[in-house]
Amino acid sequence: MAMKFRAHDTFFIRKGWLSKGMKYVQSKPDVFIAKDENPMDVLGIGANMVKALRYWLQAVGLTTEPNKGKRTQSFTLFGQSVYEHDRYIEEMGTLYLLHYKLASNKEEATAWYYFFNEFNMSEFTRDDFVSFLQQRIRMEEEASDVAIRSLNDDFTCIINTYLPRYKTSPNRVAPESNIDCPFGELGLIDILSREKKTYRKAIPSVNTRDPW
């Protein structure tokens, strides 16, 4: 099976991104490849963020695009359902489903798959996970040359996806900041020590476990 690392270009999912992406996939399926309009102007984000959003829509299972020909995006059945029933991703249950899609997507989000399905350390550092990931990669001949920088960036992106920045940098980011990823609401990762940069996998609160 193919493996993919650092396809996010270091950009984690920001609040509102997935909703914005779905809106334009619905109205303009070629939004990411159109030559008549600049995707940056249409989406209101920078070039690298456009690439990241294109990747994330597919990684969380909302959209798909062909490997050949005109690579326009279209909704998956799951994506169509989310767009019809919770396009602004306001329900906790929708977040859980998006997380499940991401964490089970070994081909498109390899580091996420290993982190949530096979990495069993409850308390860990970056080096712990990257070393574990390197061991798994060595078992896959086609992915044996993955750069350590890519693995480090994937770890950082995982942390930024699930851990709000007001916890990691409380003096620099306000709790209501919209730069955070909505997946942080799930409470799946917590920080043990900002100084030592140690983290732990967390058990979601009762409120988030009753999402509907």
Show which residues each predicted segment covers.
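Donor-sugar nucleotide-binding helix/loop cap in glycosyltransferases
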Residues: 1-212
